Regions:
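Active-site nucleotide-donor binding segment shared across nucleotidyl transfer reactions
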Residues: 25-58, 67
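Short, conserved charged micro-motifs
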Residues: 68-72
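A short secondary-structure junction signal
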Residues: 134-141
Length: 192
């Protein structure tokens, strides 16, 4: 689901994200970290020699070891310029991805409009972990990741964005509200 921006706003957002990317690359070079672009960022780089024209974020990945080293280095090298936002840093943050956010900026996606944490212009950072070669174990890992990501969203967002109308959508939204209430009432935390 993409938000539509006027061209000037989108270009300003993309320029700011490129500045964040330059600092990300600097850390990766200084600390000899392996990284690569991902999803729309990789497509944009190959197909458009930059951003996909409507893309509003940059996605980068690092192997888990390098991801952990990046988080430590980012806090050391740029403590006054950026905030690391993830489940460990803020229990009101509902996503499993880490965002490296430029301080002094504000950027809130529609799906995250009701969460209780400050959000700024960011770089999405994904750690890549090894998965099992055993198909059964791999499916369990994939299901666990999917399930817990949804629980984290429900913990922080009373009514997630769900497209569509009708009885089914209304029932799912009601179930989400009930799940949110349960998780908040009984103190589910990402850190537990």
């Amino acid at each position: 689901m993409f938000k539509e921006y006027d061209e000037e706003t989108l270009k300003k957002l993309q320029r700011t994200e490129l500045e964040i990317l330059k600092d990300f690359l600097w850390i990766c070079e200084q600390y000899d970290l392996t990284y690569f672009s991902f999803a729309g960022t990789a497509i944009g780089a190959l197909r458009h020699k930059g951003f996909i024209p409507w893309d509003d974020d940059i996605d980068v990945c690092l192997p888990r070891k390098d991801y952990e080293a990046f988080i430590r280095a980012a806090k050391k090298e740029f403590p006054d310029k950026y905030t690391v936002m993830n489940a460990e840093e803020n229990e009101n943050y509902p996503l499993t991805t880490t965002r490296w956010m430029l301080k002094g900026t504000s950027f809130r996606e529609e799906a995250l409009k009701d969460i209780d944490c400050e959000l700024g212009v960011f770089l999405d950072i994904y750690p890549f972990d090894n998965v099992s070669d055993d198909e059964k174990e791999y499916k369990k890992q994939a299901w666990d990741a999917w399930f817990w990501s949804k629980i984290l969203i429900l913990r922080c967002i009373r009514e997630p964005v769900i497209l569509g109308t009708g009885f089914r959508v209304s029932a799912v939204k009601a179930a989400c509200r009930a799940g949110h209430w349960f998780l908040k009432t009984f103190g589910f935390s990402k850190k537990k």
